[in-house]
């Protein structure tokens, strides 16, 4: 794990940068570039936008749709046009302010505009802080799947202002906790009880230290393997089914909730292939997360999306599995095992959270 100077994490590699974690960072952010394009989602609290605009005096501010609605080629093209309309120069910077979807989009804009300009990110959700803002993966979705178009474009710096987390309802905060918990399963098991602790909450005494350690896991991985030639693939634990659930439900299942469900499926597969039984850990997280019930699904519904996932190839569907805690590995899992364990997973999901009828699936606003 890379050294942490209190709440500063250094990310190494060809273009090293730092991740700062603390409160009140939005108002204190500074970049060396004289011109800045600020990109933020429509549902971001206006106080956050006001603070960053006062700190950076952007040449252009672009508001985009919220969550994954911004990660489309039409939105991407529209943002590029907005930058071109103000003649933003090559020595300018793009700043992404918001959740992980917006920072993914903003990074891809920065990587593409004038063949690449400086990029900075100010994640305002736990998911954005733990996962999307660190590592340099940027991009947008296609109807055929998530993140199929993009680029590796590391930021110059990341600022995680923990005060922004106080605005998040539990379901949104818990989405980011899923990625942090994943880091505990694949690399740092000390994170597991800390994430489930009452102290891990917005403003809680365990928040910043636990957040820093979760980010440090990913920082260490991407320092050693930026472009996912080896170890970085382990960060996809739980994501093969997660991406399939998102696609099969037309993205009505939020990413972090899909990851929670996907980690339990991966734990079942790990056990089926001879690994330790870690399903107690993944079920404990689901109980803490309290994800919304899934709509009725079958293996045949999600299989086409798993088969076209980036983690699939001509020899089968590749999954990240666990021999034990902090012992991840890659395996191609036969379809018959995937089907059998999906049926087992679905039964446990039903026992955990009964599937509602199609006309009573709760919205994000009605989930406790």
UniProtKB/Swiss-Prot annotation:
GO terms for molecular function: 3-dehydroquinate synthase activity; metal ion binding; nucleotide binding. Gene3D superfamilies: 3.40.50.1970, Dehydroquinate synthase-like - alpha domain. Binds 1 divalent metal cation per subunit. Can use either Co(2+) or Zn(2+). Its EC number is 4.2.3.4. Keywords: Amino-acid biosynthesis, Aromatic amino acid biosynthesis, Cobalt, Cytoplasm, Lyase, Metal-binding, NAD, Nucleotide-binding, Zinc. Its main location: cytoplasm. It is found in: Cytoplasm. GO terms for cellular component: cytoplasm. Catalyzes the conversion of 3-deoxy-D-arabino-heptulosonate 7-phosphate (DAHP) to dehydroquinate (DHQ). HAMAP family: DHQ_synthase. This is 3-dehydroquinate synthase. It comes from Deinococcus geothermalis (strain DSM 11300 / CIP 105573 / AG-3a).
